[in-house]
UniProtKB/Swiss-Prot annotation:
InterPro entries (alphabetical): Ribosomal_uS7, Ribosomal_uS7_bac/org-type, Ribosomal_uS7_CS, Ribosomal_uS7_dom, Ribosomal_uS7_dom_sf
Xref: Pfam families: Ribosomal_S7
Top-level division of the source organism's lineage: Bacteria
Keyword Transport (UniProt): no
Name of the protein in its database record: Small ribosomal subunit protein uS7
Protein family according to the UniProt entry: Belongs to the universal ribosomal protein uS7 family.
GO cellular component term of the entry, any: small ribosomal subunit
GO annotation terms (biological process): translation
Keyword Ribosomal protein in record: yes
Amino acid sequence: MSRRNAAEKRPVLPDPQFNNRLASMMVHRLMKHGKKSTAQKILSDAFGLINERTGSDPIELFETAVKNVTPLVEVRARRVGGATYQVPMEVRQERGIAMALRWLVNFSRSRNGRSMAQKLAGELMDAANEAGNAVRKREETHKMAEANKAFAHYRY
């Protein structure tokens, strides 16, 4: 472990196009090999498709989707006397949002065919309607935490 001080957390600036911090975080999650403009185009195309299909504000739908996918608890491995327990722990809001964005991007990428914008739009709309793989992943995480509730006293 480093002997120096922990790196200071930089504030996330709002996205210039949508004036939204979550959108900016999503662009960073979508980005591959430093190609930020490509990631921004994918997100804006996805928002365009959402607006086309639903007729509602894509930013509102996006925020709802992220809220529906954000986990409240997770399990973490804790070693106690030779045994490893899955200990349920609360998720800080920042980490929860990061996990939600990661899941949305990963499950969008694993969807079949079409462009990334279409896949992302589909996953976001599913998540906003409490369906889709990202929401299922959150439910799975919560079930794991519930199943291991007996080890909650090992929290650290």
